[in-house]
From Swiss-Prot:
Keywords: Electron transport, Hydrolase, Membrane, Metal-binding, Metalloprotease, Mitochondrion, Mitochondrion inner membrane, Protease, Respiratory chain, Transit peptide, Transport, Zinc. One of its GO terms (biological process) is proteolysis. It comes from the Eukaryota. This is Ubiquinol-cytochrome-c reductase complex core protein I, mitochondrial. Belongs to the peptidase M16 family. UQCRC1/QCR1 subfamily. It comes from Euglena gracilis. It is a peripheral membrane protein. GO terms for molecular function: metal ion binding; metalloendopeptidase activity. Gene3D superfamilies: Metalloenzyme, LuxS/M16 peptidase-like. GO terms for cellular component: mitochondrial inner membrane. The active site is at residue 73. Its cofactor is Zn(2+). Zn(2+) binds at residues 70, 74, 150. InterPro entries: Metalloenz_LuxS/M16, MPP/UQCRC_Complex, Pept_M16_N, Pept_M16_Zn_BS, Peptidase_M16_C.
Length: 494
């Protein structure tokens, strides 16, 4: 008996799927006179997520105050004029609620998961910690060691460190090139109460904040609460709109204690609000991922290229696992990191050094680049439809739960000014043709820019000593197969 493909199943169920999407509750949105926005998606039930999303992250920092947005997140839980830290914690426990926050490169979010009846008190606490936090010098000094410990935990994760290096190489000299936690010197000494207060004054303004609700929420009630607690926020200065300059290059850090090689390669793309953004989402899904631990029966381009024999006429050899069945590539995953004005599309690979299909580990880059170039020029109808269907499924899965929905609403309201209905997103996705992707792929992956990593075969590399171990190498990456990498690219290795 033949098992039908995922594409054929979804093709036949598409009409029913569209009706289900049309029946979904709409996202309601209003704004206060000061620009503060309120957005919500309600559904039947007893629980919900309410939170405040703020257009303020590490990209709006400088090298001098790098880390201040994340430091502020910690300080806002230390107490206000009418609530101590213990009062805030007790208030959450009394409601059976959960208070949390996160800081990213572009956004900061504070949210509460609670019962419907407790929404007014939850918003009261959120407004209090955001607008009335005391942020004393004593609390500031006490929190430094906590953040240092958090930084040590993050730096123990190679993937986190590598992605920070990737952003630093791609966007050096701009806010997107800065890490979220900031350097150790800033955390331990440089960040002051004055810096934090200035950051709040500049970025915590009406037009850059939104109250978001998802689940058992009443939109009218949220509007009243927003007017009560956030109506007096200043409009502030317009958000900076400076162009983020993509530089490219490569960074490498040697760690003899790590038995595996981690490699990340990325290319400049348009930002999340660009008309081609949805096509880049499909391209990311098309490339997909491969994991040796999950087996090799996968359908993504990366997975199939690793599993199948891959012959390179230039080298005259097959690139495949050796006869003993040992595959040196542990994983190969595509990613897209989009921001408001720019993005990074690329892949992250983990492999055993010196064992990459009989060549040096740098051949992972060359091998993966061949697949990137192939899909940017020649995509079959089957893999194209599969990628679109998988993107639909992935999008639906990411919207599971009130917190995920609230986060989606908050980020879209800050990025686009409104949330795109899921049905509209799927209609846009269905309208994309294979030719559209073939048009966008080369423009992203093969573009020639004024700066970047240059040809892999040529150029000098500057050596910079890092105090915490290893050498950090900057400059063009040499490739033993002598294949150029597009200039608008960035390479990081650890």
């Amino acid at each position: 008996m033949t098992t039908p493909s995922l594409s054929s199943i979804l093709r036949h169920t598409r009409p029913i799927f569209k009706e289900t999407l049309r029946a979904a509750r709409p996202t309601l949105q209003n704004a206060l006179p000061n620009g503060f926005r309120i957005a919500s998606e309600s559904k039947d039930g007893d629980t919900c997520t309410v939170g405040v999303w703020i257009d303020a992250g590490s990209r709006w920092e400088t090298e001098k105050n790098n880390g201040v947005a994340h430091f502020l997140e910690h300080m806002n839980f230390k107490g206000t004029g009418k609530r101590s830290r213990q009062d805030i914690e007790f208030g959450m426990e009394k409601m059976g609620a959960h208070l949390n926050a996160y800081t990213s490169r572009e956004h900061t979010c504070y949210y509460v998961k609670c019962f419907k009846k407790d929404v007014p008190e939850a918003v009261d606490i959120l407004a209090d910690i955001l607008l009335n936090s005391k942020r004393t010098e004593q609390d500031l000094d006490a929190e430094r060691q906590t953040i240092v410990q958090e930084k040590e935990d993050v730096e123990a994760r190679i993937d986190e460190v590598l992605m920070d290096h990737l952003h630093s190489a791609a966007f050096e000299g701009s806010g997107l090139g800065l890490s979220i936690l900031g350097p150790l010197e800033n955390i331990q000494k440089s960040i002051t109460k004055g810096m934090i207060d200035d950051f709040v004054k500049t970025h915590y303004t009406g037009p850059r904040m939104a109250l978001v609700g998802s689940g058992a929420v009443d939109h009218g009630q949220l509007c009243d609460l927003a007017s009560k607690y956030f109506g007096a926020l200043p409009t502030g200065q317009p958000k900076p709109s400076g162009f983020t300059r993509f530089l490219g290059g490569d960074k490498r850090e040697t760690n003899q204690l790590n038995p595996l090689t981690h490699v990340a390669v990325a290319f400049q793309t348009p930002g999340i609000s660009h008309p081609d953004a949805i096509k880049i989402k499909v391209l990311e899904q098309l490339l997909g991922s491969y994991s040796r631990d999950k087996g090799e029966a996968a359908y993504s381009c990366f997975a199939r290229a690793i599993v199948m024999d891959f012959y390179d006429p230039k080298v005259g050899q097959f690139f495949r696992p050796n006869k003993a069945g040992h595959n040196p590539i542990h994983s190969l995953n595509a990613f897209w990191a989009p921001y408001s004005d720019v993005g990074l599309l690329g892949f992250y690979a983990i492999a055993e050094p010196g064992k990459s299909y009989g060549h040096e580990w740098e051949n992972i880059l060359h091998y993966a680049m061949r697949e990137l170039i192939r899909v940017s020029r020649n995509i079959s109808e089957e893999e194209f439809e599969r990628a679109k269907n998988q993107l639909k499924l992935q999008t639906m899965l990411q919207l599971d739960g009130t917190t995920n929905i609230a986060d989606d609403i908050g980020r879209q309201v800050l990025s686009f000014g409104a949330r795109v209905p899921l049905a509209s997103f799927f209609e846009q996705l269905d309208a994309i043709s294979r030719e559209d992707l073939i048009r966008v792929g080369p423009r992203v992956l093969l573009r020639q820019g004024p700066r970047g990593g240059g040809d892999w075969r040529h150029g000098q590399r500057a050596r910079v000593r890092r105090p915490a171990g290893g050498d950090l190498l900057r400059g063009p990456l040499s490739c033993p197969l002598c294949t150029p990498l597009p200039r608008q690219s960035v390479v990081c290795m650890a």
